[in-house]
Amino acid sequence: MRIPVVLIAATVLAGVVTGSAAATAPAPAVPSTVPSPVVTGPIPATSRPGDPSHGYPFFATDQNLRAYGYVEEEYFVGGTANRYTTPDGATGTVIDGNHEYRTRIVVRRPVSPRKFNGTAVVEWYNVTNTFDYEVVWSRSFRHLLEAGYVWVGVSAQATGVHSARGLKAWSPNRYGTLDLTDGGTVGEDALSYDAFSQAAQALRHPRGVNPLSGMKVRTLIATGQSQSASRLTTYANSVHPLAPVFDAIAIVDGGVALRTDLTTKVFKTASEYDVLSNQAARRQPDTDRFVYWEIAGASHSDRHAYLVNNPIRLRDAGVSGLLAGPTAPCVAPARSNVPYEYVLDAMFDHIVGWVRQGVQPPVAPRIEVTDTSTRPATANRDAYQIIKGGIRLAAVAVPTERNTGWNTGLTPDRDSACQQGGTWIPFDDTTLRELYPTHARYVQAVRQVTAQNVRDGFLVSADAEATIRAAERADVP
């Protein structure tokens, strides 16, 4: 099994990697008291994705996993779960236990153990839209596949299982036995925390069927975005400390402040939208257990994630997300084109090095916020209305368009979606010629910024190469 490259060139140039750091690195999390659930499966698909009989996993990926040497499988996991108190910023207590549950996990893993890098990224499905939604996968799937990660989606919340758009309604034949309410006796998603912990435990200490086909996990990373990031923050603060199963928790675009006394490593990222919405007022300094990055120009719901997941949303849920570009019902063309996924790719690799070798991820500059009492928070911007500060990928440091994290709806009912989508406004030809007299000048500027991002640890080499290739192909000026 190989360890993902943690931006070796960047960390060496930055002087981060030292022999003493590796020698004194903390050990990964030890097996906890969380029970291993009973695993059944893989649940066979009886129809192809898109078939109206719905005999396949909900949100089955349309990516060509075979080309990467991967397979997608769905399993049911079940057992008994506790309910917990979740006091603000404090460890909770068990209210009661022995609540029966059964839910599902979706596993995307290498076929060959030789390709597995030893790390499983376990995503808490977002259920804002009342169905399971895999945001982190939609952003970082390419890097996860290329670097040999396992990705696991967990249906942790009752909303995703029991709602009118949930799994049971979508395919009664496939999902009729799932239950996150103990027969209707438990509400408020109280069993979600144990369902999530036990799903992770099934990867490291399987009971019955091994959902990883015998592959051994070295590192478990929990992740979630937006709504599920908020649930994950509560989990990190109040439930996970009772019985740690994850080596690290990656919180993307959401959540309240993290406790400063947590022993599990937490890596938090925030788009420009999230910084201006609420995260600027919740900023915390980096420590040996907490890292926080802000990404300039990135939106909560960006163009890349939309293009990846919207066809599947339409196929399985029958609804579309906010359209990208000028056709969206927003004041400005919608959905930032800043590749937020590139920063998340670097984050995952850093987490592995942080957990296994004790290599501290780099500190990132913060967005230049001047007033958090306004909504959105007030921040410094340049002449092109691009925000200052934060991690600055080439899309904002060498701009050909105005990418921002905040937009406004044409009508009040569209305001929230438009705000989260941000803006993507291409520069006109005159502006492009003023900025970049020649195409070569533009490409050189992109190369310089991208090389610096790699040295700083905010970009992995494959994404740097993709950035430069895109600049070379761009019709600029």
Per-region residue spans from a language model:
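C-terminal His-loop and adjacent cap/lid subdomain of alpha/beta-hydrolase
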Residues: 27-477
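Secretory targeting and sorting signals
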Residues: 1-26
